[in-house]
Amino acid sequence: MKKKHLVIVGVIILSAIVILGLYQTFALSGDITKDTNSYYNVTITDGTTVTVPANSTKTVYYKLTNINKGIVKYGVGYSGTNITVKYYTDTTDPVTGTVDYGKSKYIKLSVENTGTTSSTATLSTILGYENGGDLIVPSGVTLVTEKKSPLSSYITNLYNNATKTAVINNSITYQYDPKNSLMKDVGNNIRYYGASPNNYIYFNCSNYSNQSSSTCETWRIIGVFDGKIKLIRNESIGEYSWDNKNVSTGAENDYGKNDWTDARLMKLLNPGYESKTTGGSLYYNAKSGNCYSGQSNATKACNFTSTGIKNATTRNLISDTIYYLGGHNSFSVYPNQIYEKERGTTVYSGRPTEWTGKIALAYPSDYGYAADLGKCSQNLNNYNNSTCTSNNWMKAIVAPNYGWLLTPRSGIASNVWYVYSSGGVYYNSYVYNAYGVAPVLFLNSDANVKSGTGTSSDPYQISV
């Protein structure tokens, strides 16, 4: 008689396909077959168990295929000292359910070691017939039932689950979440706003296993954009030219060129320009040298050995992202208006409309939306209003004096947008000027936090 009960099938082993990114990532594959006793088995090839370093996380992509003519229940179990396994909310398939003949399930799992020494995690597949009742988990094995949300999902859920208040600015009605100081802009991005939101996060750490104010920098979360967290450094890295080329070095005039794709500040912040004798990738590689500052190719000494990107771990957290370079020729605009212009096609003759890279600057709209629009009803050039400056958390970061923004002026070849020391936003500064630089970047979409509440005394801590 064929057995109609749950069968615990052997241990699933993980194949060692490692993908560089926020986590070490593995692909896992198993095929379900049926033996002569009507048991369902999992066939594994090229496998090893997963060793997780102390206080670290690995992401596992688990593939399960049923090649038997039948439907079976499935679940995923795990064991290991100080090991916790959770499933991601953006997993392709659920962590438990049924799998049809010829079909596969793709489950995204987080394997975390909370101990102070490395530990080995063992994953196992638990199977049963479709009508065979609940899955029975053997002794020493834990069924994966907890979910792990990326930080972007966590913040999005904070906003979605909160009570909203309508705020009208420039005839646009925004939905504000006063409890968490979150709002949704005209592009459906979720942003932090106000005087002092809880958007602090440790980043650029020398030791991610022991994150603190002595091992990490404090950055701020601008918001969630296309499923990715956007950060800004909590203070400037110094004052440098946005670009200071002259006619002899490639500009249309001697005041610099407002093309971010070739800007000297871009080459200072990003990788790939190490061969440049001045400024090339110095911030990205935490090195010292000379940087461009002042008119007509002028330079000054610069040192990023303590303020630059510290290590490969941090560099692997940074996502390549499209930054928009649409311009505008009037600073009498509201946040919703300049947001659309940034993503538009109005540029100075021949300038590109977007750039893909790792590190850039804040948009004018980032600065504009950081203000509490329920209190600050001005257009951007009037953000020097004391009510606006006192209710905009980004003011002290971007412009304790003058601070550069990313967006070019579309009508002139050598002007870009910037924040004046008083808090107003303008576009009429020559790019050769040396203004404050607050780096902006996006984390990889699967970035998670292991602890923290986002307050200044308890910043979020990234799980790596």
Predicted segments with their positions:
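C-terminal, structured domain-capping segment
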Residues: 27, 103-142
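Short beta-strand elements of extracellular/lumenal beta-sandwich folds
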Residues: 54-68, 107-110
